[in-house]
Design a protein with these regions (language model features):
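Active-site phosphate/ATP/adenylate-binding loop shared across adenylate-forming ligases
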Residues: 4, 38-205, 211, 223-229, ...
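Conserved AMP-binding/adenylate-forming
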Residues: 193-290
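Short, solvent-exposed loop/turn segments at the edges of secondary structure
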Residues: 181, 239-241, 306
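Nucleotide 5′-phosphate-binding alpha/beta core
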Residues: 1-68, 73-91, 95-99, 103, ...
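AMP-binding/adenylate-forming catalytic core of the ANL superfamily
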Residues: 157, 264, 269-378, 397
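Conserved beta-strand termini and adjacent loop/short-helix elements that scaffold enzyme active sites
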Residues: 137, 213, 247, 342, ...
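Generic structural signal for residues in well-ordered beta-strands
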Residues: 134, 210, 244, 337-339, ...
Length: 407
């Protein structure tokens, strides 16, 4: 189902619309989108230097709401929304959720955290706009989540992908037959994840189809891009609202379509805090190949994760998603892991902590298998510690995948 005609605009018309909105929002006079590459970037440091409200284009008193990032690497990124921004965000979330398969009347179990985090509110607003009732459970209390999923019969689960695994385990621990749940869709975002984890989620919650969502608080929160339920091969970017580029992470030079690089976004309609050429730190590629679903928008592919989470070990770039992909190729490895980085002399050393799927698994054998597949996938030797089931920390929000002990 198509929510907005903008999802099927011919590419040439879309570029004209983007150029018009770019000029209107930023007062730029450029003849083509190719001129964008000559303009400066904004980044996390830009926002930190302007903390908390230095980049607002309207007085604080004219805002309708304020959200903020988690501030994992320092002070949080504060984002303001005018009433028009909230309306835009709601429409974008309705568009995303519709392309992901949500229909009017479907009961949505929202296990994303509410508060400063945008995830809970964004999905709530989008569902209500579609006409899908919401159970605003928020995060935490996995046993209660399992009970409510069973008793209320929700058809849609919203959470981070790592928390979906926690909920699936809670369903089993509560003695509930996962096959008795009425779940049809899982809408997951807030952290990078792989097709391997998608498979683990769908096995833990049978009948559910897992769909990937992408967003960041600096843009609006969730609602920037999402997979279509028909294909699930790349996240459709809402290009009438966000202009996306791929640049070289080191030089900032534009890269051709299909090359892997850093995602850069420009907001085209935001009022409170428009951002020009914002460097996300997220590594992926872009394709404008037509999608079988009928949408013409560009798609994000191969989203590895943030450069902040990348670890360089003996000259090799290692992302948590690389580790996840390798581990989940092993049937005895559970979808819970952490990457621990430590300094040994002048070298960085990597240890992957993981768990077996059950206490009956031979941990020595799993360790050997894990070290082998990690060496094959990463090209370097990595130490693996197999911990007892339930030892790797769980999270109700974004999973902590990298533990840096070098300082």
């Amino acid at each position: 189902m198509i929510w907005s005609p903008a999802e099927q605009l011919p590419r040439a018309e879309l570029r004209v619309l983007q150029l018009e909105r770019l000029g209107s929002t930023f007062g730029l006079e450029i003849d083509s989108l190719d001129g964008l590459s000559g303009l400066p970037f904004t980044s996390k440091s830009t926002l930190r230097d302007a903390y908390p409200f230095g980049l607002l284009r309207v007085p604080v008193g004219e805002l309708a709401r304020v959200h903020a990032s988690s501030g994992t690497h320092g002070k949080p990124t504060v984002v303001g929304y005018t009433p028009a921004d909230l309306e835009m965000w709601t429409e974008l979330m309705a568009r995303c959720m519709t392309l992901a398969g949500v229909r009017p009347g479907m009961l949505v179990h929202n296990a994303n955290t509410y508060g400063l985090f945008t995830g809970g509110h964004g999905f709530h607003q989008g569902a209500e706009r579609i006409g899908a009732p919401v159970v605003p459970v928020s995060g935490g209390m996995a046993t209660r989540q399992a009970m409510l999923l069973h008793d209320l019969g929700a058809q849609v689960l919203v959470s981070t992908p790592s928390y979906a695994i926690v909920v699936g385990q809670a369903v089993q621990n509560a003695g509930i037959d996962p096959g008795s749940l009425k779940l049809e869709l899982g809408l997951f975002g807030g952290e990078p994840w792989t097709d391997g984890l998608r498979g683990e989620i769908e096995r833990a919650l049978p009948g559910l189809r897992a769909v990937n969502f992408y967003g960041l608080s600096e843009m609006c929160g969730p609602g920037v891009a999402a997979e279509c339920i028909e294909v699930r091969e790349g996240l459709h970017v809402h290009e009438d609202h966000f202009l996306v580029e791929i640049v070289d992470p080191q030089s900032g030079a534009p890269l051709p379509e299909g090359d892997e690089g850093e995602l850069v976004f420009t907001t085209l309609l935001k009022e409170a805090m428009p951002l020009l050429r914002y460097r996300t730190g997220d590594i992926a590629s872009i394709t404008t190949e037509p999608c079988p679903c009928g949408r013409t928008t560009a798609r994000i592919r191969g989203l590895r994760g943030r450069r902040d989470d990348m670890v360089i070990v003996r000259g090799v770039n290692v992302y948590p998603s690389n580790v996840e992909h390798a581990l989940l190729s092993l049937p005895d490895a559970a979808p819970h892991y952490q990457v621990v980085v430590e300094r040994s002399g002048s070298m960085d050393e990597l240890t992957v902590q993981c768990e077996p799927v059950g206490a009956e698994v031979d941990s020595v054998g799993l360790r050997g298998d894990a070290e082998r597949v990690l060496r094959e996938h990463l090209g370097i030797r990595v130490r693996v510690d197999v911990l007892a089931p339930g030892t790797v920390p769980r999270s109700e929000g974004k999973a902590v995948r990298v533990v840096d002990r070098r300082s």
